[in-house]
Amino acid sequence: VPSGLPKYHVVLWDFGAKQNILRKLHSLDCELTVVPAGTSAEEILKLNPDGIMLSNGPGDPKDNPEIIAELAKLCQSQIPIFGICLGHQLMALANGANTIKMKYGHRGANQPVKNVETGSIYITSQNHGYTVDSDSLPASAKVSYINMNDGTCEGITYQNFPGFSVQFHP
């Protein structure tokens, strides 16, 4: 790739993205196309992205049935998809899993999570009151990170398409 040209074209589906996410993607030589929450799967696919990123955002993920339906279509496209926070929850719902309201949400920059494959533990920043119900995941999805305080799902890897997501803010 010639110097100065972006390596990847990433569509950021914006549900309330933090500016630091955009800065980080730019620093990784990504050409970004930011699209609003109401964008259809067809419109996103017309942009011909190398990858799709689902941003963080507020609220109950189940309040977004139109987004969930469009995301289910994107998951069949075989384009890599990465979700953060609300994006993580929406991707789980789009693949048949369930989300539940937590008794005590995860708030702050001191939430320990464990990579279930490597055993590595990371201190993460989180701000959410809903979690993906691990027991509801389809066979094609595997929990990749868990919260060390309460054992809730903090990450998922999908085996039927190139998708992965995390509940925390990387």
Regions found by a protein language model. Give the residues of each.
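Catalytic beta-strand/loop cores that center a nucleophilic Ser/Cys/Thr
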Residues: 120-161
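Active-site-proximal beta-strand elements of phosphoester/diester hydrolases
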Residues: 9-14, 124-125, 164-168
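RNA-binding accessory domains that recognize and position tRNA/RNA substrates
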Residues: 1-48, 61
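Cysteine-nucleophile active-site neighborhood
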Residues: 46, 50-51, 55-131
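Beta-strand-turn-beta hairpins that frame and shape the catalytic cleft
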Residues: 4-10, 118-121, 158-163
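Hydrophobic residues at beta-strand termini and immediately following loops
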Residues: 13, 35, 102, 146, ...
